[in-house]
Structures are given as structure tokens and as C-alpha cells.
């Protein structure tokens, strides 16, 4: 019996689990994988804002003095490239000036200017894609007498949809906001929508000359248009204006007044009729009268007849006088004012104009009268500081 008791104690001591830190237990497995990656950032706002239309009025300027809505003085380049219509105005307002689109800045005098156009750059591009899925969690701990802890949960779910929708209509602020927040569960929230288009679209600039939107069929040297009419509906953007007119086979234009589509404030003088021709030569002298009638016939059994009558009187009267010469006139209508002008601006405007010193008799005489003062003969709409141009691009 003593032997059996000793044997049982030996077996029990052999099977006992060590309790000290220096024992031979298997270490606990490591935890699972980390969270998913961050979502991508949304795209920045798009560039491409043009403060002025292409063509004649393509120079953005900050101007101090407006002259009747058609010219400006004391102009200079904006201090930085405008990002939108409001930004252009803000840059110029900061120095006490106005945002203008001008023909050419000559010694601070912009000559021909019109108001800037509204709107902003295109909205931002699509936001970036969300981050990739988070890494898979670690495997579960191995099965043992004391199993390891469960592996970490899987990383974040799908990395998020595309950062943002399209950047919105023209104008507006920057495009979508940043694509998404931290990854974690969803890889990132959707990026913000792109900015909306700028409000208050004006098809044509305000002012005296170019405020009437028109759809025109025929362009004349880029400064005049024929066969113009109002667009069929109010344009909502520059592209919409062009589309409305293109549907009728016409072009979008900004015009002064739709008067049979004629444009351009000053044009080269065109002549009236030449002076009347000289009168015909005087009529020839009348023929001499006929000879005297014959003597009476002698007496006889058959007396002769009476002599003929005397010849006719003198010939017809002198010919009429020649007609008087004509006087020069500009064509009736839009270009009815004859002017002598000193300075031509790109063939579409004139400065320093005045009435000719006398009434010209014909186009050559008109040119001679003006040339005597070192000026050119022109037919103008109105002598208003010589500013001109009826139509320009949208």
C-alpha cells in the first residue's frame, strides 16, 4: 500500500501545470489587422475662367474713369489673374477701379472698353476614389488548451465611392470638397458635389453699346452683322446662347441696336452722285431764210402763178444751260453724319472727329476737305468722341 501511494504522488506531480512565468506555455497569438485606408481627396476646382471674351475686347483691365459706357481712362492690368467674375471685380475695386474688357491699353487709356463678363471657372473634377479596402484581420489564434484571442476584425469596408460628382456648371466655387474622411469603416465618404454655376448670367455686357443679345446670320469683317434677331429664349450661359443661335444657323452676337443688323460706328466715306454733266452745246444758228419768191409771171394767154413766200425766220433758239453739279451726302440711316476724323482704331472706330469745314460736293471733294486738316473723310453714326463698333463676340 505504501508503494501505491508513493506512485500516485509521483504521477500527480508530473502532470501538474507550471504556474511560474518561466514555464513552457505557448504565447497568445497577435491581434488582427488594422483599419482600412483613408479615402482619397476630392479634385480641386477647375481653372479656365476667362474674364474677357475672345476677339476685339480681350484685354482685362482695371479702369478708373468711364466715358459714357464706351471708353475708359486710366487703365492698368489687374494685380493678379482673375479666378471668376466676382474676383475680377474685387481685384479692381480694391484699388478704387472698375473691371473692364478693353480693345487695347495705350498709355493708360483703354480707348474702347465694355463691362467684364460674369461667371466663374469650371467646377472641380471628380473627387479621388476612396482608399482601398483595409487589410484583412489576423487569423484566429491556434486551438490549444488555452486558445489565443480572435484575430482583429477585417479592415474597413469598401474604400468609398468616387470622391465627388462632376464639378457642376460653369462658374461657381471650387469643385467638390475633399473626397472623404478617414478610412476606418467605409474608406471615405463621397466627395462633395462640384460648385454650382455662378448666378446672374448676362448674355451681353451692360452699357451703351453692346447690351443687346442677337442671333445674326452674316458677319462682316468681324465688326458688323446682318440679318439679326432676338434669340428664341433667354440664354442661361454662354454655351446656351451659342446653341440657341446655332439651331437657327446663326451666330451669337452682342449688338448696339438691331437696325437691319448694320454695325460699325464709322466706315469709310462713300460718294454721292457726280456733279451733273454740262448742258448741251448751244443750238446751231437757224438756217437762212429762203430766197425771195420768184417774180410774178409775165402777162400772156396763160399768166404765171404768184412768186413763192419769203424764206423762214431764223433757226431755233439756243440750247438749254447745263445742269448744276450735285452735293455729297452720307447714306441715310445709321451712317448719315459726315465727319473728318484724326485717329482710326483698328478700322472700326475713330477719335477726334469734327464736321467738315464746308459742304463737300462729291466724295473726292469730301476727302480733300478732310485731308487739308490732316484727317480722313468718314460717315459716322454720331460724333460721340468717335467711339464705334456695333457688334462684337459672346
UniProtKB/Swiss-Prot annotation:
What are the coiled-coil residue ranges? none
Q: Where are the transmembrane segments?
A: none
InterPro entries from the UniProt entry = Cerato-ulmin_hydrophobin, Hydrophobin_sf
Region feature (Hydrophobin 3): 326-394
Q: How is it modified after translation?
A: Several N-termini starting at positions 17, 20, 22, 28 and 48 have been identified by direct sequencing.
Q: Where is this region: Hydrophobin 2?
A: 200-270
Which stretches does the entry tag as region Disordered?
17-42, 135-157
Q: List the disulfide bonds.
A: 52-101, 62-92, 63-75, 102-113
Signal peptide start-end: 1-16
Location in the cell reads: Secreted, Cell wall; Secreted
Q: Pfam family example for this protein?
A: Hydrophobin_2
Keyword hit for Disulfide bond: yes
Q: Name one GO cellular component term.
A: extracellular region
The UniProt entry's sequence similarity note says: Belongs to the cerato-ulmin hydrophobin family.
Protein name according to UniProt? Class II hydrophobin TH1
What is the protein's species of origin? Claviceps fusiformis
Q: What taxonomic ancestry is recorded?
A: Eukaryota, Fungi, Dikarya, Ascomycota, Pezizomycotina
Amino acid at each position: 500500500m505504501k508503494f501505491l501511494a508513493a506512485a500516485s504522488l509521483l504521477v500527480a506531480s508530473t502532470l501538474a501545470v507550471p504556474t511560474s512565468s518561466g514555464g513552457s506555455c505557448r504565447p497568445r497569438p497577435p491581434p488582427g489587422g488594422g483599419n482600412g485606408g483613408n479615402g482619397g481627396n476630392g479634385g480641386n476646382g477647375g481653372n479656365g475662367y476667362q474674364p474677357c471674351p475672345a476677339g476685339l475686347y480681350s484685354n482685362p483691365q482695371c479702369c478708373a474713369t468711364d466715358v459714357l459706357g464706351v471708353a475708359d481712362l486710366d487703365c492698368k492690368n489687374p494685380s493678379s489673374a482673375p479666378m471668376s467674375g466676382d474676383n475680377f471685380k474685387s481685384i479692381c475695386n480694391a484699388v478704387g477701379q472698375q473691371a473692364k474688357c478693353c480693345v487695347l491699353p495705350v498709355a493708360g487709356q483703354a480707348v474702347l472698353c465694355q463691362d467684364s463678363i460674369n461667371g466663374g471657372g469650371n467646377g472641380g473634377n471628380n473627387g479621388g476614389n476612396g482608399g482601398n479596402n483595409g487589410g484583412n484581420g489576423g487569423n484566429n489564434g491556434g486551438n490549444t488548451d488555452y486558445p489565443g484571442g480572435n484575430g482583429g476584425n477585417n479592415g474597413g469596408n469598401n474604400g468609398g465611392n468616387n470622391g465627388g460628382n462632376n464639378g457642376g456648371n460653369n462658374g461657381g466655387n471650387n469643385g467638390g470638397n475633399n473626397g472623404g474622411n478617414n478610412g476606418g469603416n467605409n474608406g471615405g465618404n463621397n466627395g462633395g458635389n462640384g460648385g454650382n454655376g455662378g448666378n446672374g448670367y448676362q448674355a451681353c455686357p451692360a452699357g451703351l453699346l453692346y447690351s443687346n443679345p442677337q442671333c445674326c446670320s452674316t458677319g462682316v469683317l468681324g465688326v458688323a452683322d446682318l440679318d439679326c434677331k432676338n434669340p428664341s429664349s433667354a440664354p442661361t450661359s454662354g454655351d446656351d446662347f451659342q446653341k440657341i443661335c446655332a439651331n437657327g444657323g446663326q451666330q451669337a452676337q452682342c449688338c448696339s441696336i438691331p437696325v437691319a443688323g448694320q454695325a460699325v460706328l464709322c466706315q469709310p466715306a462713300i460718294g454721292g452722285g457726280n456733279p451733273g454733266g454740262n448742258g448741251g452745246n448751244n443750238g446751231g444758228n437757224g438756217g437762212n431764210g429762203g430766197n425771195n419768191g420768184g417774180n410774178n409771171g409775165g402777162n400772156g394767154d396763160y399768166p404765171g402763178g404768184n412768186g413763192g413766200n419769203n424764206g423762214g425766220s431764223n433757226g431755233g433758239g439756243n440750247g438749254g444751260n447745263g445742269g448744276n453739279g450735285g452735293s455729297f451726302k452720307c447714306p441715310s440711316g445709321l451712317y448719315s453724319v459726315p465727319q473728318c476724323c484724326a485717329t482710326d482704331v483698328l478700322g472700326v472706330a475713330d477719335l477726334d472727329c469734327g464736321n467738315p469745314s464746308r459742304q463737300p460736293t462729291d466724295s473726292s471733294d469730301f476727302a480733300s476737305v478732310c485731308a487739308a486738316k490732316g484727317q480722313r473723310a468718314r460717315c459716322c453714326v454720331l460724333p460721340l468722341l468717335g467711339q464705334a463698333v456695333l457688334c462684337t463676340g459672346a
